[in-house]
Structures are given as C-alpha cells and as structure tokens.
Amino acid sequence: MKIIARNKKALFDYSIIERFEAGIVLKGSEVVALRAGRANLKDSFVRIIKSEIFLLNSHISLLHTTHSFYKHEERGARKLLMHRKQIDKLLGKVSIEGYTIVALDLYFNTKNKVKATLALAKGKNLHDKRETLKKKQADLEARAAMKNYK
C-alpha cells in the first residue's frame, strides 16, 4: 500500500469516530499525476449530493507532459465509490448528529487502484487541540528521555 497524500490537518482539527475505504473515479491524467505524487488533501472535504458521495476541493496537479486535450480540472469534484448502505449510514450521521466526513489519505492498494480513506469525524474545540498538542509534546519528551537513558 503506497500512500500518495495524507491530510494531517484533519487529524489535528477533528476527532475520528470511524474510518471507511472508498474508491475514486479518476481520469487517466489524474492517475499519472498521482503516481508522480502530485496530490494535496489539505483543504478537501466530502459532501453527499443526491445520494452520491463526492470529494471536493482536493488538489491534483497537472504534469507538464500532459497534452491540453487530456488536462483535468485541478480542484474539481471527484466522485467516490462506496456501497449504498455505507453512504446511507454516513448521511444519517452527518445530517442528524452533527458529524462531518473528511478525507484522511489517498493511496494505491495492492491491485494498483486509487483508494481514499474517509473518516466520520467530529470537530475539536480549541481546548481539545491544545490538549492534543500537550500530549504530543509529553510523548516526545518521554521518548527523548528513554533514548538518552540507554
């Protein structure tokens, strides 16, 4: 499993409730750009529109070798492929309980298909983010102390 892009900001801003795997509909030029590692999920988000699920605002750069006929939209909406039951479950959670869906990463699976890891998440408050930073800092200091002890 080769990870193409990871959304680190989502892990900081949201507490992850549940993870899902989804296929993604891409054009040929987008797949070539992903193989070159030209993707960014920083500001991306997921929406359910007419019982179909889309990844919006994800950035896949154009390669300079791509012919103008085959060029894709860099920040276009990309359809995600999931089972109907999973989409309905996500729709119920998002509409009623105040959760959101975020894209965590893009990767090539063992069959060389591009997959996206989605997460059902709830936004963190400012004090939760501070607590996460404090915990991370304490873990780093503990590791450094253990390293120096040996």
UniProtKB/Swiss-Prot annotation:
Listed Pfam families: SmpB
Key words of the record: Cytoplasm, RNA-binding
UniProt cross-references to InterPro entries, sorted A to Z: SmpB, SsrA-bd_prot
KW Cytoplasm (keyword) present: yes
First-listed, main subcellular location of the protein, grouped into a coarse class: cytoplasm
Lineage: superkingdom: Bacteria
One GO MF term: RNA binding
Keyword Kinase: no
One of the GO BP terms on file: trans-translation
N-terminal signal peptide: none
SUPFAM superfamilies from the UniProt entry: Small protein B (SmpB)
Compartments it resides in: Cytoplasm
CC annotations in GO: cytosol
Family (UniProt): Belongs to the SmpB family.
Function of the molecule: Required for rescue of stalled ribosomes mediated by trans-translation. Binds to transfer-messenger RNA (tmRNA), required for stable association of tmRNA with ribosomes. tmRNA and SmpB together mimic tRNA shape, replacing the anticodon stem-loop with SmpB. tmRNA is encoded by the ssrA gene; the 2 termini fold to resemble tRNA(Ala) and it encodes a 'tag peptide', a short internal open reading frame. During trans-translation Ala-aminoacylated tmRNA acts like a tRNA, entering the A-site of stalled ribosomes, displacing the stalled mRNA.
Matches recorded under NCBIfam families: PRK05422.1, smpB
Name of the protein: SsrA-binding protein
Organism: Campylobacter jejuni subsp. doylei (strain ATCC BAA-1458 / RM4099 / 269.97)
Organism lineage string: Bacteria, Pseudomonadati, Campylobacterota, Epsilonproteobacteria, Campylobacterales
